[in-house]
Every structure is written in structure tokens, then in C-alpha cells.
Amino acid sequence: ALTLLQKGHKVEILDFGKSDSIPLKKSKTFKSVKSDAQFSANFFYGADLEGINEPNDNEVFKYPVRRPSISTVNMYDNEEDTRQFQPIFSNYKGGLALAWGANSIEFNQDDMIGFEYTKQDIEAAYKKAYKRFHVSGPVKDDDLSSLVNESHKFNSSHDMCSADDAFKRYAMFKYKFFPKNKNVLIGQSRLAIDNRLNSNQKCNSCGLCIWGCPSNSIYTPLNTLKDCQKFNNFKYTNNIKVSHFISNNGIIEYVADTSGARYKVDNVILAAGAINSAIILLKSLKENKITDKNLIRTAGLLDTEVIKIPYLSLSKMFKPFTTDKIQFNGLMAMVKNRNKDFPSWTQVELLSLGSLIYQ
């Protein structure tokens, strides 16, 4: 949307657009929140303490209850077939990116297998995006630099907790003595975190990443939405639940919402998330008599299994527990793929769950 606005086009966003919980003040840290027993109980577990894990709870990781933007309940009343997996939804302004990550990894040419364009064709767009997102990473090349974000040189880095440093040092020690055994490469993650020295949004290691960054250091689409709202040729309409498109001779002329209202359009970009975009598209096909099937099932990314491997850092067992980087991924890894039908390397997320555990 911002790129179109900068080129002089008129842009209107139709969004459901609820607002997520407001982050705490910039002066707050994990330790300061925890020091107030009554406030911290409400903050971490909810007013009714519904966020406390049950004895038989087998989930390794949960998003906090104070982030309603992350939910397993879809506003489309489960019209989609999700029997093979449990999807995560966001019905909030900014979408899943409000609490989903900040990982910023570009495709390399090896990833472009099967595409009709090359890495070079999209490299300029990557550079513009990284500048806009203030992506931070290793200022000096690491073991991943030839595989990840090869075209981008980082001007700022993000801090890593002591557990991250210990994990990375162990990997480097292993490579030093076993140089031929480099099937798993570990390095600093590439994150959309504004960590520039002169930035007033610089990360201060408060430890509240997953509960909402008080410094607004972590990029979210809300940042770009604010930039869009500076243009006179931009309109944002929320409280809209899009139902389907109405076409004439294969050309989309209207967007219809669930209340029956129609919105005249010239061009449409569908960006309602992987599942809800599919719901809107499939309903559009049926409403416009392009298909009469009630269910179209394809195999896709969300049908694949996720492999979770817990890792215990024994060297940290007798060290003080740190709260500067709780539940955030300061490291990433690339694993060599032996299947010739896939790219040579597969990305692995190393999720820090405190000082002792990685997932």
C-alpha cells in the first residue's frame, strides 16, 4: 500500500481492524512488572488467571492472554477445513505480525526453484523493505552470511542474551575442531528491530517482547499504516468483514462485505492471511458461478508437520536467570537438506524460552 501511495495511486484498505492491547510505558521492564505482585498476576495471566497452565497442559509455548491479536478462533466461523492442523488467526489491525515475529529472511537463488523469476529480479525490493523495517543482524559476517541476506549489509546489530552467546560459542567451537561437519550452521537472527544508535525506538532489552514492545522497536505493519495515513490519497476503513468479490466478465468490480454493502474497486489486492484469503477467494468463485464445489482441498504448507527439538544448555544451569530476552529468537540456524527436490538449506528457528531452553 505504501509503495502504491508513493507512486501517486489512490489506495483504500478494508479491514476488520480491532486494536490490540496497548504496550506498557517505555520505562517498564520484565523485572519491574514482576516486582508488583498484584499487577504482574493480571498482566501475565489475565484478570481471571486464565493464562496459568493446567497440570495436564502439554504445550511448550503459549502466547500471553493479554495479546488478543493472537487467537485460535476465526471470525469466519470455521468455514474452512482445518481438521489436519490448528491454525492461528488474527482479527486485529496489523494482523499476525503484531506478535508473530520480526524474522526478516530473504530468498536466495536456491530458494527460487520453480519460480519464473530470479533472486536478482526482487533484490531491489528487498533492499527497500530492509531499509523501511530497520532490519538488524550481524555487522560482521557470520557462518550464515553466504546463505541468508547475502545482498544486505547490516549497519546495526541486536543484543543477544547470555544463553544465545553460549549457544553460538559452542557451535563455533565445534566447527573449529570438526570443520567438515557443517550440516547445521548457527548465527545471529536477522530481525526487524530498530536498533540504530540514534533511534529513539532503540531496543533497551526490557524482556517484554512477547507482551508488546514498550519501545516500539519491533517492526509491525502498524508502523507502515501510520506512514500510509500521511497521504491524502489514502483511506482506511475498519469494522469491515469482507465476504467475496463480485466480477463481470472475469473483472472484479465490487468487494462485498457480510452486511451486504458493496465497494467499487478498480484493482484488488487480497491480503487477509493464508486461510481467510482462501476463504474469500473460494466464496468469490462460488458466488460468481465459476465453481459449484463446496470444498476444494489442496496440500500446502500448513499440512506439513512441525518438528520440535528441545535443547538444554547445561552450561547455564548454575548461572543467574536473565530476563533481558524472554521468549524471543536471537539466533537462527540453517540445516543442510539432503533431498534434491528441495532447496539445499532449510531455515530453523531457535526460540529462546528463558536462559535454559531452546525449541
PLM-predicted stretches and their roles:
Residues 1-3:
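Conserved beta-strand->loop/alpha-helix structural units within folded catalytic cores of enzymes
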